[in-house]
Amino acid sequence: MGLKVAINKKSFEKNGKSFFYLADTCWSAFTNINENDWKYYLQYRKRQGYNVLQINILPQWDASATDLNHSPYQKDEKGNYQFDKLNDSYFNHARSMCEVAKEYGFELALVVLWCNYVPATWANNMLSHNTMPYEEIDGYIKKVNETFTDLDPLYVISGDTDLNEEISCSYYLKASQLLHELAPNCLQSLHVRGRLMEIPEKLIKQMDFYMFQSGHNAKLENRAMPYCLPEYFIEHYPVKPLLNSEPCYEQMGYSSNMYGRFHQFEIRRAAWQSILTGAFAGITYGAAGIYSWHTYGKEFANEVGEGFDSPNPWHLAIHYPGAWDYSDIKVIFDNYEITELSSAQNLLMNGIDDIRAALTNNKLLLIYVPENTKIKLKLETTAIDKITIIDLETRHREVGTVSSCQGGCMVGMHIFEHDALYVVDLK
């Protein structure tokens, strides 16, 4: 059995038990990873607690160069895909990799049509030579269904797409409708472009859960995306499970060829801000060097896509510390038996949007504090049983202090050097 939407319509369950979607991003798996490296990767992420893999079914347009030669279609004399000539060997290979992943206990979130294959998207406008003809969608979707559906994947209909043009939307709508008919028990979503909020109603209706992308743009005006996006989805769309499927990746160069990279703190901040704003169905980790599967001595096309700087090889990227920070989110959810969150921003009196607060299903108040400060709450001290403060980098724990102040109470500063999660037990 695959994942199902829980009865609260806001999270997932599997076999009747709550399921926190903790994914790693491995878009280029089917084209770039050999068998031995695949098994090493799977066992390592499994040890870290990950339970979902996000993979692109077709070749990732900004994957790193590879010596492997896996092509989903036969090619013409110019090297372009002949979309009426599927390569069975490619899909057999992808199927085999998925079977191994399932043996390690992973769920599969498979992207059906990355935006470069769909006309009039931002990526297709940059690189249009492998645009899938509309009439070939049927044959491709049939092949996708035959190859993967009995593995109970999540089908992510789009990849990194904008939805500005009717022709683009028509591709995704057709693919979604076909898969709903062929694979009615497989949940569907869309993976949209960074910072995209507005999704056509006809596509919203097709989705079983929502993915948004706070993305990799480091401009100051975009720093609030991890909580602005879930706020928008919650306000404007019907209730469905919601998650940040592409926060900033660890060690990813800033987009638009801007100098700098995202580090452990930035990716942790994006995750906790999204989750405590209402995107608590799960979170996706990403590491530069893993999603493109970069190896020593191979090229990375900086000019393709959003203009990211070159990554480290996957051998280094797999050991980035932020992957443990994301796995610790699931540990916290499990340890505190958290299955649902509701925003508690109204309890904060600091007036700082970067600080996020949420109430759990079991009388806990969670507060994420990216920079150390006193926290003013619209609560009486008598409403609080105890406060545990977790240093999100070292996992050290501190017993918090609280005192009365005008209009409520004041939680004292912590003694750590990093961002922290306050777990407030309410009476």
Language-model-derived ranges and their functions:
Residues 250-252, 267-399, 416-427:
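Aromatic- and carboxylate-lined catalytic core of secreted/periplasmic carbohydrate-active enzymes
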Residues 48-49, 104, 150-151, 206, ...:
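Structured helix-beta-strand junction loops
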Residues 2-221:
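Active-site mouth of glycoside hydrolases
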Residues 42, 98, 145, 176, ...:
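Short amphipathic alpha-helical segments and helix-helix/interface helices
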Residues 204, 209-296:
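Catalytic-core region of carbohydrate-active enzymes that cleave or remodel glycosidic bonds
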Residues 155, 159, 245, 390:
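Active-site flanking residues adjacent to catalytic metal/cofactor-binding acidic residues
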Residues 1-48, 363, 375-400, 414-427:
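Non-catalytic accessory regions flanking glycosidase/transglycosidase catalytic cores in CAZymes
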